[in-house]
Every structure is written in structure tokens, then in C-alpha cells.
């Protein structure tokens, strides 16, 4: 098996990949993550996942590289990482009582053969109708400023969620494991 590399700085994606009990390393790709003008959210996520994998391939030309990215959308509006407290307040205020689709893009790039498999796995979350006090309390406790849509379902964020719908709950955290297992199998990597 070629070296397996996760092209991500996310500790949550690292934890998810570790569940598969495969040896892997982590590299943080340094790319511009800005959406392009008029770009559909799922295309933004897919483009960034692929760009991250290709960036890491520049340094590791014999590796099997996993790239991923996530973009949240509310009625077509892209909700990226808030980065600041004020932006997170704005996002959660906008999202309260509404449904948000998280587009989790995944690619597996074989740097040696230059074969790339890619997909976007959507996951829908309906948020509770939170008060301003609840939003502030959540943000003070969780500080999800590096998470698309200002929510971390793997932590206290589950308390601000009313319902979830999708094929793979791991997609909400940012790494669709069910689809990843299929992609790895097509590269000769069996998880079990």
C-alpha cells in the first residue's frame, strides 16, 4: 500500500480517519480557500478538496492522498468558517430554526498514477430556534470559529441541532467515511 496521507489540518477529520485503523500521516495544505465568484457551494467544496490533495502531492509524489473540504449553505448562501465571534453570531442568528445543507467534498488522489476519485456528500441539519442568549452561551463554550456554519456536532453543537438527515453522519463532521472506504477499496486498500 502506498503511504496514506490526510491533506487536512482538522483534528476532527484526523480522528475520523483513525477509526478505520489504517496507518496514515497528516499534512496541512496551504491553499487559498476563497470561493470563486458565482461558484456553486458543492463545486467550491469539491474544488478545494482536490486542490488540497494536489498540493500535498507536490511533496509526496508516491502517496495516496485524501483531500476534503466542507461548505455549508442556507438557501443558496455559502456559510464558510466564521473565523471570528461576531461572524459566528451572525451565522447562527441566520440559521436558527432553519435547515442548512453541509456539502462535504472528498477526494482520493493517487499521486503516482494521477488518478483522482471525488464526490460530494450532502448532510442536512435543522437548527433549533435559539435565543440570542443561547447563541452567545454556545459560542462562549464551544468556540467553533474554524467550523463551516459555526457548529460542531461532535461536541456541544449537538445541543443546537433539532434534526439531521443524510447517508453518512461522518459527512457532517467533514469526512464521509462510507464513501471513503469505497474509494480506498478501488485503490486496493481494504479497511477490513
UniProtKB/Swiss-Prot annotation:
Presence of keyword Hydrolase: yes
The record's annotation in Gene3D superfamilies points to: 3.90.950.10
Site location (Important for substrate specificity): 12, 70, 154
Q: Which GO terms describe its molecular function?
A: nucleoside triphosphate diphosphatase activity
Query: What keywords does the record list, in alphabetical order?
Result: Cytoplasm, Hydrolase, Nucleotide metabolism
Required cofactor(s): a divalent metal cation
GO cellular component terms, alphabetically, are:
cytoplasm
What CDD domains would the database entry show?
Maf
The protein's matches in InterPro entries, at most eight in alphabetical order, are given as: ITPase-like_fam, Maf-like
Active site feature: 69 (proton acceptor)
The family this protein is said to belong to: Belongs to the Maf family. YceF subfamily.
Function in brief: Nucleoside triphosphate pyrophosphatase that hydrolyzes 7-methyl-GTP (m(7)GTP). May have a dual role in cell division arrest and in preventing the incorporation of modified nucleotides into cellular nucleic acids.
Question: Which HAMAP family does UniProt cross-reference here?
Answer: Maf
- Protein name per UniProt: 7-methyl-GTP pyrophosphatase
**From which source organism is this entry?**
Methylobacillus flagellatus (strain ATCC 51484 / DSM 6875 / VKM B-1610 / KT)
Amino acid at each position: 500500500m502506498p503511504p496514506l496521507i490526510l491533506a487536512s489540518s482538522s483534528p476532527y477529520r484526523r480522528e475520523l480517519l483513525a477509526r478505520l485503523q489504517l496507518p496514515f500521516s497528516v499534512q496541512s495544505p496551504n491553499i487559498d480557500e476563497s470561493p470563486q465568484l458565482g461558484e456553486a457551494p458543492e463545486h467550491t467544496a469539491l474544488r478545494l478538496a482536490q486542490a488540497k490533495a494536489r498540493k500535498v502531492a507536490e511533496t509526496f509524489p508516491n502517496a495516496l492522498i485524501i483531500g476534503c473540504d466542507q461548505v455549508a449553505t442556507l438557501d443558496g448562501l455559502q456559510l464558510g468558517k466564521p473565523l471570528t465571534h461576531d461572524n459566528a453570531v451572525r451565522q447562527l442568528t441566520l440559521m436558527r430554526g432553519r435547515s442548512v445543507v453541509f456539502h462535504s467534498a472528498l477526494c482520493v488522489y493517487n499521486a503516482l498514477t494521477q488518478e483522482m476519485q471525488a464526490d460530494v456528500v450532502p448532510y442536512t441539519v435543522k437548527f433549533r430556534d435559539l435565543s440570542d442568549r443561547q447563541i452567545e452561551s454556545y459560542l462562549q463554550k464551544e468556540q467553533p470559529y474554524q467550523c463551516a456554519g459555526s457548529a460542531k456536532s461532535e461536541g456541544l453543537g449537538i445541543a443546537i441541532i433539532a434534526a439531521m438527515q443524510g447517508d453518512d453522519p461522518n459527512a457532517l463532521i467533514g469526512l464521509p467515511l462510507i464513501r471513503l472506504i469505497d474509494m480506498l477499496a478501488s485503490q486496493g486498500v481494504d479497511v477490513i
